[in-house]
């Protein structure tokens, strides 16, 4: 079992989607998840906090999402793993696959250095859209859920093809065509065709 402590709905859904990837099929490797909001800490306080967390959970591996500026910090404790927020999801998966075979439990801490960096891979609404697609939401249902207009959603969907390797991009594009063309104007169809040419 795991828990996600965050007030950000977008972030929660995005992380839930990450956990449902194949590398986390066996939940015993995922002990718990906590999101630490350190917006009130200084950089040196962040390093101290990491060390304290490591000392408290010696039997578990800990993963932090943060900027490479902190990854190269001299204060980086041993056996605490870092995922660069500027890396691709493919690189994240490669690192997570290695950690899956560790004997100890896996504690994942998503660390936000608020006001200093932002997690570019988990860009808010785009990750929620991915979650909605996987849950089988229709185009109209996603529009209502996010409280945005149809054209805005089309723009989001077109940009999402840059987030994935080709096989998933193709299936995402098929979803867009199947769900948007039936309920949208020809103008959207032209827009999506152009986006596919550039993004996929």
Swiss-Prot record:
Topology with respect to the bilayer: Single-pass membrane protein
GO cellular component: membrane
TM helices/strands, residue ranges: 104-124
Keywords of this entry: Membrane, Plasmid, Transmembrane, Transmembrane helix
Organism whose genome encodes this protein: Escherichia coli (strain K12)
Localization (cell): Membrane
Chief place of localization: membrane
Lineage: Bacteria, Pseudomonadati, Pseudomonadota, Gammaproteobacteria, Enterobacterales
Protein's recorded name: Uncharacterized membrane protein YuaF
């Amino acid at each position: 079992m795991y828990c996600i402590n965050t007030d950000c709905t977008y972030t929660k859904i995005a992380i839930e989607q990450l956990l449902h990837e194949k590398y986390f099929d066996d939940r015993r490797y995922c002990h718990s998840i906590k999101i630490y909001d350190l917006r009130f800490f200084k950089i040196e306080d962040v390093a101290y906090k990491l060390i304290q967390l490591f000392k408290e959970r010696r039997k578990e591996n800990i993963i932090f999402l943060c900027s490479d500026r902190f990854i190269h910090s001299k204060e980086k404790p041993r056996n605490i793993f870092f995922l660069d927020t500027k890396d691709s999801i493919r690189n994240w998966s490669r690192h997570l696959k290695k950690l899956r075979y560790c004997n100890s439990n896996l504690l994942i801490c998503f660390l936000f250095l608020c006001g200093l960096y932002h997690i570019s891979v988990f860009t808010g609404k785009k990750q929620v859209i991915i979650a909605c697609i996987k849950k089988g939401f229709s185009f109209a249902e996603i529009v209502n859920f996010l409280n945005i207009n149809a054209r805005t959603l089309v723009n989001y969907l077109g940009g999402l093809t840059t987030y994935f390797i080709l096989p998933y991009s193709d299936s995402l594009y098929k979803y867009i065509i199947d769900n948007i063309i039936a309920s949208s104007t020809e103008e959207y169809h032209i827009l999506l065709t152009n986006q596919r040419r550039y993004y996929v």
